[in-house]
């Protein structure tokens, strides 16, 4: 649903927070279920994504995922690397705090000036524009360690519905409201 709506609205980047670095504290059965769900999705839908000209990009500490899943991720990224209509960024084993720490460590290791540009260039999202819009579902009003650096000027909408219940009408309603916002990035 969301993918098709993004395509209809000419949205070029969609980032989904699928598994946080903190989610490892969940029951093992749930973690296995979530990883299996992703594996099934990638295996079943990769050809459809290619057909629709959709690029997959994964961000997070991917090297800490099960090796079977890592291979599937690399394969999916490789198969879709030249697709241009929509880029879906899947945040997997992602935590913004560790992303920032790793970025700063990389800047120090490279012995370059620590500034906004160098930190931004060393984030997992260095090749992705900062989000214009964040929709947080589930009636939770927090960022949950998601894209803390990148969300500085993002318009944030909190939706009471849970993700599985979030539908095309909800998406269009939020997008319609978002389009009416005059974005000034800190200026008047």
Residue ranges and their predicted role:
Residues 1-188:
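Flexible, compositionally biased loop and terminal segments
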């Amino acid at each position: 649903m969301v993918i098709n709506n993004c395509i209809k609205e000419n949205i070029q980047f969609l980032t989904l927070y699928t598994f946080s670095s903190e989610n490892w504290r969940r029951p093992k059965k749930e973690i296995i279920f979530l990883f299996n769900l992703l594996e099934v999705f990638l295996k079943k839908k990769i050809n459809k994504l290619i057909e629709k000209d959709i690029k997959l990009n994964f961000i997070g500490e991917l090297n800490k995922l099960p090796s079977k899943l890592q291979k599937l991720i690399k394969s999916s990224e490789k198969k879709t690397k030249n697709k241009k209509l929509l880029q879906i960024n899947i945040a997997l084993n992602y935590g913004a705090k560790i992303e920032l720490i790793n970025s700063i460590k990389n800047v120090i290791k490279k012995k370059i000036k620590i500034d906004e540009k160098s930190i931004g260039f060393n984030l997992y999202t260095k090749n992705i524009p900062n989000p214009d819009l964040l929709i947080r579902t589930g009636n939770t009003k927090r960022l949950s360690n998601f894209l803390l650096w990148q969300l500085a000027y993002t318009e944030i909408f909190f939706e009471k519905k849970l993700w599985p219940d979030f539908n095309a009408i909800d998406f269009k309603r939020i997008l319609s409201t978002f389009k009416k916002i005059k974005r000034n990035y800190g200026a008047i």
